UniProtKB/Swiss-Prot annotation:
Membrane side Cytoplasmic: residue ranges: 47-54, 121-139, 218-237, 293-317
Keyword Disulfide bond: yes
Coiled-coil regions listed in the entry: none
PANTHER family: G-PROTEIN COUPLED RECEPTOR, OLFACTORY RECEPTOR
Segments in the Extracellular topological domain: 1-25, 76-99, 161-197, 259-271
The name this protein goes by in its record: Olfactory receptor 6N2
General function of this protein: Odorant receptor.
Length: 317
């Protein structure tokens, strides 16, 4: 049998959690709690924004789309990670690995585009307030959100196709906590310089270009805010952007170090740490950032809860 035929390599083995030892149970509980908090928090924000008419604005429309995206983003990796922590056989099929990698990168790219759209929305609201209602219509918001999803799901296709055609040897142990391009390419039996170059070009285009546009938007926002004469006006303008900027810095800060690099070898510890940040930590803190720092969402949550409570009370009368 040809040792370079990937059909002979039916599955991969994850070694990311192989050395957790006696802390396995605690790690499982912590990761499970983080996942449940992420699901519940993002579901709450998505539902409240959709149900409360006061939040039917472009800014909150994008926040709800981001919360919905985070639900699927975490679902591509964390359930399998939880299974691998408890299971003695930490495996995934060849096709399953490619699918996980594709959806993880598709949703990640979609988030990059969506965060850019949100920055543009804030730029229009603060720098061009008179034109904002005319430009940022409901139709445009829907089209921008759809474009973010579409472009995101198109971006990794070429990377996945190239990875699927690589020959893999008998060594099938992935030194990571989930399937991803860098650890997958390190297992190939041939030179992967072309793959690394393609990955770098696509990642650099998506990550650096979107991050650049976000920073340009915020540079103009800061310039406009500093021209506001009243302190209360400046504070209100900055508060509308603080949550989004915090999410941008956490998310982009980790993925830039992870994916915008031209090398095959990498630090396993650093990559696993960064993977935890952008696959677990960022989706988990999004609900905290957008709810605890946002009075409108807190008020909407209270209105939703009290309205349901009042309806339940009336139903029992």
């Amino acid at each position: 049998m040809d040792q370079y035929n990937h059909s002979s390599l039916a599955e991969f083995v994850f070694l990311g959690f192989a050395s957790v030892g006696y802390v396995r149970g605690w790690l499982f509980v912590l990761l499970l709690l983080a996942y449940l908090f992420t699901i519940c928090g993002n579901m709450l924000i998505f539902s409240v924004i959709r149900l409360d008419a006061a939040l039917h604005t472009p800014m909150y429309h994008f926040v709800s789309v981001l919360s919905f995206l985070e639900l699927w983003y975490t679902a591509t990796t964390i359930p399998k990670m939880l299974s691998n922590i408890l299971s003695e056989k930490k495996t995934i099929s060849f096709a399953g690995c490619l699918l996980q990698t594709y959806f993880f990168h598709s949703l990640g790219a979609s988030e990059c585009y969506l965060l850019t759209a949100m920055a543009y929305d804030r730029y229009l609201a603060i720098c061009r307030p008179l034109h904002y209602p005319i430009i940022m219509t409901t139709t445009l918001c829907a089209k921008m959100a759809a474009a973010c999803w579409t472009c995101g799901f198109l971006c990794p296709i070429s990377e996945v196709i190239l990875a699927s055609q690589l020959p893999f040897c008998a060594y099938n142990e992935i030194q990571h906590i989930f399937c991803d391009f860098p650890p997958l390419l390190s297992l190939a039996c041939k030179d992967t310089s072309a793959n690394i170059l393609v990955d770098f070009a696509i990642n650099a285009f998506i990550i650096l270009i979107t991050f650049f546009f976000i920073m340009i938007s915020y540079a103009r926002i800061i310039g406009a805010v500093l021209k506001i004469k009243t302190a209360s006006g400046r504070k209100k303008a900055f508060s509308t952007c603080a949550s989004h900027l915090a999410v941008v810095l956490i998310f982009f800060g980790s993925i830039i170090f992870m994916y915008v690099r031209l090398k095959k070898s990498y630090s396993l510890t650093l990559d696993r740490t960064l993977a935890i940040v952008y696959s677990v930590l960022t989706p988990m803190v999004n609900p905290i950032i957008y709810s605890l720092r946002n009075k409108e969402i807190i008020k909407a949550i209270k209105r939703t809860i009290f309205q349901k409570g009042d309806k339940a009370s009336l139903a029992h009368l």
